[in-house]
Structure formats: C-alpha cells, structure tokens
C-alpha cells in the first residue's frame, strides 16, 4: 500500500473560508521542519511561474523556427491546441501540489505516490528536474545575452558580436541573478511582482505599436497560411515540428510547486499559481502571436533573417521604436532567468535535504540572516555556468548540452502525474483537486507529454548536419545513463526517497523560523 498523508487543516473561524490551511502543520505532517520563511502570497506564487513561462521571452526566442515549421497556421492554431494540453498537465500537477506542498515538488511527490521502488522513482525524477532547470537557466541567460548583443549591434553598427562575448555576457547575467537570489525571499517576491507588470505592460506596448504603426498588415486569411521550410518533404511532419514553439515556451510552471514552503496557504495557492500562470500565459501569448503574425511584411525576408521577430519590429516600427521594444524583450528574459534560478535553488535545497546530492549537508543549509538556501543558489549558478562554457568554442556544443532542458522537465512532470493515476482511489487529494475529472485529465496530460517528448527528440531540420542535428536524445541518454549507474553503484543504498525527520510534534520542535 502506498503511504497516505492527509492535509492538516485548522478549524475555520466565523465568516472565514472553511478551507483554512495550517501551513506548518502540513509541512510537519510530511516530516519536515520549517526552515524557510513564508513571504509568498498567492500573487507571488503565481508570479514566479508566469515569469518563468514568460511569453515574451519564449515567443521571441522561437518564433523564427515556427515561421519555417508550419508558418502562421501552426504558430496560431498550434499555440491554441498545445496551450490546452499544457493546461491539462498543469491541472494534473496542481492536484499533486495541493496534496504535497513541498520544495521537493516533483521528486518528493513521486517518492510518496510510488507503491514500490520509491527511492528509484524519486531519484530519477529529481535528477531530470535538476538537469532540466539548470539547462533552462543557462539557455535563458544565453538568449538574453544574444538579444543584448542584437540591441548593441542596432545601436552601434560597427559592433560585431562574437561567441566569446556572448558567453561572458551570459556569465555576468547568471552571476547577477545569483546575487539577487542570495538576499531575502521578500526581495525575490518583489522582483517577481515587478516582472508580471513588466510582461503585461510590455505586451500591451508591443502589441499596440504593432497594431497602430505599421503601414501594412496581412489579411485575416493569412492566419491559415502554411509554410514548410524545414527541409523535410512531409508537410505533416513539418507542421508537427512547429508545435514545439509552444511547448518550448510553456516550461517552468513547476516553479509554483517548488515555492510551496515559502507560500502562505500553499495547499491552495500553489496549485492556483500553476494553473493561473498557464491560463494567463496562453491568452496573452496568443495575443502577442497574432500581433507578430499579422505584422509580417515580407515573409521570405523575415523568415530568412537571424532574428525574425526583431526584423518584424524593424520593418513595421522603424529602427528607433524597434530598439525600445527590444529593451522590453531583454528585460523579460532577465526576469525569466531570475525566476528560473529561484525555482532551481529550491529544488536543490529539497533534494539535498533528503540526501540525494553529493555534499547534501552543505547545499540544504539556510542562511541565518536571510533565511534563504544561499549555498544552493551558488551551486545552481556554478552548474549553469558550466553548461555555458562550451559555447566559448562552439555554439553547437552549447545547444547540444542545454537541449535536455525541455524534455527533461516534461518527463519529470509526467512521473508524479502517472504515479498518481496508478494509485487510483488510494490517492488522497488536498483541498485543491479535480474531482472526477482528475483521472481523464491526468491521462491526457501523460499521453501528451509522451507524444511531445518524442517530438522534442526527432530531427528538426534537413539535411541533418553537425549544426542542425537534434542532440536532445543524446543529452537525455547521458543524463539517464549517469543517473542509472550512480543509482546502482551507491545511491540506492543511501537514498530511499523523501526522508521524514520524525513525528509532527518532533519536527515542529526543529523549526528554525
């Protein structure tokens, strides 16, 4: 039988919501003392996932690929369809988050939901999540560095970007994001609030200027236009690859789950943060996608440019206004990386707390001054920088290494959802749950993750060369092989899954804050 953990609730006082959650009691029931401060309100929890998904950063980074893999038809209708499927994933994850609101999130819930081999399920989920998040931090920093260089090149035409400069700028960005995460979680919460408004106001500015300023817009029927410039003769295959644009954007919403131990009323606010961030991102992203699609003037010129969304801005708004829009995009990317690093450090903190990482005692320690896992922050920074370094010599090498980002995260998302489905009626939900819709939505989520994971690992351009080869399956295989060898060599004897520090009354006495 699987372990069943009820969600402790305080008695509701007169006039209050009957679901009043005692956050500390919930954490103690799961075997953990309180070491982090609860400064995240509902909006803050939503903000971190909304910032990591970051529709401005995601769409501007991948729009060009979509123009050649399906064109407007897949960019728009693919966005709608994939958004719905991702919302199913988020809803299924949210149900699990309500039952197990801990920083460990995916790996913790996998260990608790597994009937057998709890340690193994938890181990592989944790490492997929860790590697995916590290790759996300590195890739987002690299994208921001690339757009910063594009802005500088527009401002000073004599400037010629180099790979060395890109790596150095990326390193500076990640280190600065590490410094911001070193201070109190209250600062992180404030920055995430600013990020939400930066994204929303930035969206309004970009979309409104694209509506008002260009002399030419495409006709309404342009949304059905199809392009397949992937090099593959099959239009169906090319269109399927175009679905990746939306999937690449919708990652990182587990951030709300990872911030559970720092969120007030986490059993309700964390799942709401997950689902709301996906829902609002889907709507705002569709608006931005339509604005960009209808502002394309010369399709061939834009699709063939090095940065198609930037070319759309230049063609439609003029160079001066385009540079202002580019600053909005750069800001969005910087906020995205900051939030991603925050989520990453909480996963490291929790994974180390359960003894899964080398030097675990070091990484799950909390600063007595800021009440944040400072050492975990700098481990995340160091690992992200290590992934960036190969870009000094080869952009292809960097792309190959970070290609595990999205597929690693989505596979980590699938594990606890699948285990919850396998548990059936034995699963005891928290106060936020899907009721009778839990199982059909969960199966749709697992099936879509399986299908999209295959897409992530298929060839994405033809002819297949060293530069165009999709290294995601190789990167994933390396992660799984290393994790498997490590598991059978030593880990299975020392790591049995999530650790309980004692009875609720015992762990309550260990609270540090």
Which sequence ranges carry the predicted segments?
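Terminal cytosolic tails of multi-pass membrane transporters
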Residues: 1-42, 417-441, 459-513
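Helix-loop-helix connectors at the membrane interface of multi-pass transporters/channels
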Residues: 9, 107-118, 141-168, 202, ...
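Transmembrane helix-boundary motif of multi-pass solute transporters/channels
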Residues: 30-146, 247, 256, 263, ...
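Helix-loop-helix junctions that connect adjacent transmembrane segments
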Residues: 31, 76, 155-165, 194-323
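Hydrophobic transmembrane alpha-helices that form the core helical bundles
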Residues: 62, 87-174, 179-182, 330-347, ...
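Transmembrane helix-loop boundary segments of multi-pass membrane transporters
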Residues: 65-76, 143, 152-164, 185-196, ...
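TM-loop-TM module centered on a large, flexible mid-protein loop between adjacent transmembrane helices
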Residues: 108-115, 150-155, 227-229, 273-340, ...
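Membrane-interface loop-to-helix entry segments
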Residues: 165-220, 251, 274-278, 402-415, ...
